[in-house]
Design a protein with these regions (language model features):
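Pyridoxal 5′-phosphate
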Residues: 1-398
Length: 398
């Protein structure tokens, strides 16, 4: 293996050197507990608030609407469970989609077991929510709509502003899982009518184990973790100061270079998509062709098993994914690909490649050249492909 090409940035990203540098003093020098009264430690409370300011500015929020959590799944659980509890006297119905991250889907299932009713919306063949279906699903008892900003597997961007407008027209709270979108797309919580938003530091070159929860002023939401008075009595536990500094620094970095960075990612992504679709037969792009995350490409290859494809790519130093990193150990096909209408056998042959700003077109050439050989080799060993080719030849002879 001569080189390593990391193309799984939807799973996690490399922590930026400047982020690590900003964090280091808070492990060994400025290690005080922000809740302590002496100045050595209390200074860290101001540092935490500075990170809140930076993140709030990035999404058009107020500083006191930003809460720090343990990650995206933590924030998603908080949004659903504690909103459901707080508004149970108003209603017991929640609307989400069939293509959400499992942090949402499994939490929704948890709530169903506790008496809440959940509608799981279908999506179209590109993975987009159909707004008419959303409107039709609303009931007098609907208290929350939760739709991800952009899908972690196929990259499709949802009509978030329109969904938020529909929610607010009906007096319903709107939560969005923006774990993949934060740092990749401009977000304004007021323009999009967002009441709650989840994000995770390690998806935009920050550290793992630290997340963000935006909660609009006036939204009633119960405490998720009970104990001390941290995070304005809504999330107990001594603050992860190094992590908070890290996620704040990463957010500032992402905001500063977003336009230039994502323009490059989009150009390289389109180069990848064009080469794969033009040079590898019996292949399809999953997700919307243009309304997709700048760094996301997701393909399905007929007559190829995704796990074998990943192993062969790994042998060439290419890191990719067959779906969400949180479910990659499962032998079941992606619930997202099934939801957009793919048959099981095609969904099983999926490959997600997600870029970063360091990936160049020359790297894509290496990837595609190897991918062509690997797909051809795997198909040679497939009896299904052999039968398909025989039928094609027989049909051509008629």
């Amino acid at each position: 293996m001569s080189k390593l090409l990391y193309l799984d940035n939807a799973a996690t990203t490399k922590t930026a050197p400047e982020v690590v540098e900003a964090m280091l003093p808070y492990f060994t020098e400025k290690f005080g507990n922000p809740s302590s009264v002496y100045s050595f430690a209390a200074a860290n409370k101001e540092v935490i608030n500075q990170q809140r300011d930076a993140i709030a500015e990035m999404i058009g929020a107020k500083s006191n609407e930003i809460y720090f959590t343990g990650g995206g799944s933590d924030s998603d659980n908080w949004a659903l469970k504690c909103t459901a509890e707080a508004y149970a006297n108003k209603g017991n119905h929640i609307i989400t989609t069939k293509i959400e991250h499992h942090a949402i889907l499994h939490t929704a299932e948890y709530l169903e077991k506790r008496g809440f009713e959940v509608t799981y919306l279908d999506v179209d063949e590109d993975g987009k929510v159909k707004l008419d279906d959303l409107k039709a699903a609303i009931r007098p008892t609907t208290i929350l709509i939760s739709v991800m900003f952009a899908n972690n597997e196929i990259g499709t961007i949802q009509p978030i502003k329109e969904i938020g407008e529909i929610a607010h027209e009906h007096g319903i709270l709107f939560h969005t899982d923006a774990v993949q979108a934060f740092g990749q797309l401009p977000i304004n919580v007021d323009e999009c009518h967002i009441d709650m938003l989840s994000a995770s530091g390690h998806k935009f070159n920050g550290p793992k184990g630290i997340g963000i929860m935006y909660i609009r002023t006036g939204v009633k939401i119960r405490s998720f973790i009970h104990g001390g008075a941290q995070e304005r009595k809504r999330r107990a536990g001594t603050e992860n100061v190094p992590g908070i500094v890290g996620i704040g620094t990463a957010a500032k970095r992402a905001a500063a270079n977003m336009e230039e960075r994502t323009a490059k990612e989009r150009e390289v992504r389109d180069y990848l998509i064009d080469r794969v679709l033009n040079e590898i037969p019996y292949c399809r792009l999953n997700g919307h062709r243009t309304d997709r995350l700048p760094n996301n490409a997701n393909f399905s290859f007929q007559f190829v098993e995704g796990e074998s494809l990943l192993i062969k790519l790994d042998m060439k130093g290419i890191c990719g994914s067959s779906g969400s990193a949180c479910t990659s150990g499962s032998l079941d096909p992606s619930h997202v690909l099934l939801a957009i209408g793919l048959p099981h056998e095609i969904a099983h042959g999926s490959l997600r490649l997600t870029l970063n700003e360091e990936i160049e077109k020359e790297d894509i050439d290496y990837v595609v050249d190897n991918l062509k050989e690997i797909v051809a080799h795997l198909r040679e060993m497939s009896p299904l492909y052999e039968d398909f080719i025989k039928k094609q030849k027989k049909h051509g002879e008629k």
